[in-house]
Amino acid sequence: MAGLTLKQQRFADEYIISGNIEQSAVKAGYSRSYARGNAHKLMANVSIKAYIDERLEVLNSE
């Protein structure tokens, strides 16, 4: 998906696997302190949310 950084894409992929916002942010490369205080902002990002929705649609159709 265009518009996402590699770190944002990693976050989204990790979130699809775990469902845990903070853990996904850390695994994607964000610092623990950022993840603790700001991971919810990643989920509010329209591009990230669209990427997650698209990936889930593909996974659910398989």
What are these regions (language model features)?
Residues M1-E62:
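N-terminal, charge-rich alpha-helical recognition modules
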